[in-house]
Regions:
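Hydrophobic beta-strand anchors of alpha/beta hydrolase catalytic cores
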Residues: 195-197
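Long hydrophobic segments that form regular secondary structure
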Residues: 70-72, 92
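A flexible loop/linker signature enriched in serine peptidases of the S9 family
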Residues: 3-12, 26-41, 52-62, 76-86, ...
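Non-catalytic accessory segments flanking enzyme active sites
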Residues: 1, 76, 96-192
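Short loop/turn segments that connect beta-strands within beta-propeller blades
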Residues: 44-48, 89-93, 140-143
Length: 197
């Protein structure tokens, strides 16, 4: 066994390139902070020539998957309450491919989500919106996504869901913007008062 990494901080989720010559992995240098973005690293399979390929990308990277030719990786990230699927080339260029990656549980759909990539680059992923639980969507040739299932039609024909609104607040401490979500009750009437939970 040979140790390939030694930075002060975690290194994890290693993925070997299709030709076996490179290793992509996630990690970060531990600066003893509450949160630090997961960074995408690349090195030779010998452990040499370690580089950061996501250096200019200001979001935490998860779920890395090599493309079939070894020219880049697919991954997921969260941005402003929305989980996304993206592609990063080995020179660090990021291309967003899909929004609304979501989980398969009704109670907490934002907590997960998954995708799969075929050798030809076709992507299938769990697509979720506040107004419906997850469905499957497909992306071909890195173009726009298309829903391919309607699994929740029966459920939604018998339920009325509350409308979800994105709201932003300004911090009184440092002026930063803070994102929030307001879900109004089903059959909401603006002339009535409702408890805030």
């Amino acid at each position: 066994i040979k140790v390939l990494t030694s930075q002060k901080g975690p290194d994890f989720s290693p993925k070997v390139s299709p030709n076996g010559k490179k290793i992509a992995f996630l990690g970060f240098k531990d600066n003893v902070q509450t949160h630090q973005n997961r960074v995408l690293y690349l090195m030779n399979s010998s452990g040499k020539n370690r580089t950061t390929i996501s250096g200019n990308f200001d979001n935490s990277i998860s779920n890395i998957v090599w493309d079939s030719l070894g020219n880049g990786l697919y991954f997921t990230y969260d941005e402003k309450g929305n989980s996304k699927v993206a592609y990063i080339s080995l020179n660090g260029k990021v291309t967003k491919l899909a929004d609304n990656l979501g989980g398969t549980t009704i109670g907490r759909p934002y907590a997960s989500g998954s995708f799969s990539v075929a050798k030809n680059g076709t992507i299938v992923y769990t697509h979720t919106r506040p107004e419906y639980p997850s469905e499957l969507a497909v992306i071909k040739d890195k173009k726009s996504s298309k829903l391919i299932t309607n699994l929740n039609e029966d459920l939604l024909s018998r339920k009325v869901l509350g409308k979800t609104e994105e709201v932003w607040y300004t911090s009184s401490f440092d002026g930063r913007k803070i994102q929030g979500w307001l879900v109004k009750p089903p059959f909401y009437d603006s002339r009535k008062k409702y408890p805030l939970l």
